Amino acid sequence: MLELNYLSISKSNNTQYGVFKQGDDYVFTCAFDVKDSLILVISDVKDEIEIKIPIDEFKYYGKIYSLVVSGLNLKKFKYYYICDDVICMDPYAKKKCLKRTFGKPYSYTDEDSIIANNEAFFSTDDYDFENDKRPLINHSDVIAYELHVRGFTKHTSSKVKGKGCFLGIIEKIPYFLELNINQIELMPSYDFYEFDKTDVISEEGCEKLNYWGYKSGNYFCPKYEYSYSKDAVSEFKDMVKALHKAGIEIIMQMYFSSDTKHTLIIDCLRYWYTEYRVDGFHVIGPKIPSELIMNDDVLIEAKLLINNINKDDYDILSLYKSSKVIDVNDGFMVAMRRFLKGDSGSLNSFVYYNRLNSPDYRTINYITKYEGFTLNDLVSYERKHNEDNGENNNDGNDENFSWNCGIEGKSAKNSIVKLRTRQIKNALCLLFLAQGTPMLFMGDEFMNTQKGNNNPYCQDNDITWLNWKLNKTSEEILSFTKMLTSFRKNSKILHQNKELMNMDYIQCGNPDISYHQEMAWKSDLSNYHIHIGIMLEGQYSESGDEDTLYITYNMHWENHVFALPRLKDSLEWELVFTTATNEESEEIKADLLNSQDEICVFKRSVVVLRAKHRPLRRINK
């Protein structure tokens, strides 16, 4: 036992990393590859006391060092390690001391600056989650929304107190509810340093800002620069509690580099799931231990989004089927983008992904995400415009499956504005009227633009900050999105727990899903066709009595006449909504009054019909 002033330090056989209180004592456990020396430095919050403890002799097994510190009469303290003269932060630190200004690098030569950025903070404060309960929303009922915490509300137009912070998300909860959003997915919100260290120690010498945060970090801490208050831990928990109270789940994106230890990955996910009560994770990185995560006893009920799951691996596949794992891939995105712009040969893929909803192969649908064009830019640019990134426009994806509607970039030409507005509505229909689970990227609901930048990883400015000031057109898109998400929410037939089979297996007279074009019950998916009608039979809904829907998609640049599947004598087709103009909408209504045999679906438009009971007609005697 080593006695240091009034402290007693003894060896521990603990293998739980980090710091925890054990009675009146504190247990410190860490793992370092030590060549010469390892020192634990503890100080009080006012920096009036500093204690340096050589801990080389407290090696437990392998690289693990563990010690018990008795007599440390501090409820709160700061600490860090010095390994072979290098100042290091505890990889398992739960709180940080320093809150920097986002985007402002620190000096790598000034010792005080280095210490301040590597000091962990420990306190025994408890947080009251009150009666918090996870919403536990069925995957088929989720309407998800991906956002960057800072970019979501940093712009002055957000009109929130906590701009760019977790508090700002709390303040926007009423907005989520208006959009019928019940799950948000946060881009990296753990503590990461926005710059990478280089040999040249100056602001100019640092690499460009990593605004997104897909990099290693202090995985057990929330990002303090995203906190409005000094207490990022409590503010994050306040956010979780408020979201849950509103019936909204929270998914955290966690990026792990290839050299991240698998034990740390599991410990990290467990900690956020149990301590912060998040609902799940989107785990990202080059070497993710998918099988280990899926098989973890603590995480078995957490929602886990994993990129490009290997469905050829039998062991992975069996775990995938039995857990709450969701496969994230770009298949839906590419298929819908190609169909939207009217590519030859795109109909087959559209039909496949529109119906894809296997309970054994859960996926998430999106047309845009953080990486790539926004929805507005998807219909405004055919080429990326990443010059502001400083890489001569060489970064970012060159293949975006986009169409600028005739003019590259911003346009005030009325015909272009109308066509782009129509295409955005069409894209939203492709997303929210498909089976499966939709995810909207922040700002797409009101035509946010990144000015053609499809890789704004280093932009902390108006390119990535949502501008909440709406014009007449963006208000129209926002209103349409709210209507569409409400329609989806209230039409269970659009988000069932099963994949539709194109069969009449309950013998009600119609299959659960059927396809139509110029002739009812017949469809030709040839390469030159870019139009299809899809009927969803209401008797196959969970309740068994929902309205039957007939959704026609015409992404061709010409009008097409669609046959209407014949209904029972007591029913008739009525228009729910269309992405066509008001004048064209009136023509469709007139067509339906004149005949229930066919309708004209105008070029580049979607029409949604439902079967309703015919009104009773009074007979005059």
Positions of PLM-derived features:
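Conserved alpha/beta catalytic core and glycan-binding cleft of carbohydrate-active enzymes
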Residues: 106, 113-116, 277, 290-449, ...
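Carboxylate/His-rich catalytic cores and anion/metal-binding grooves
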Residues: 176-208, 372, 376, 380-384
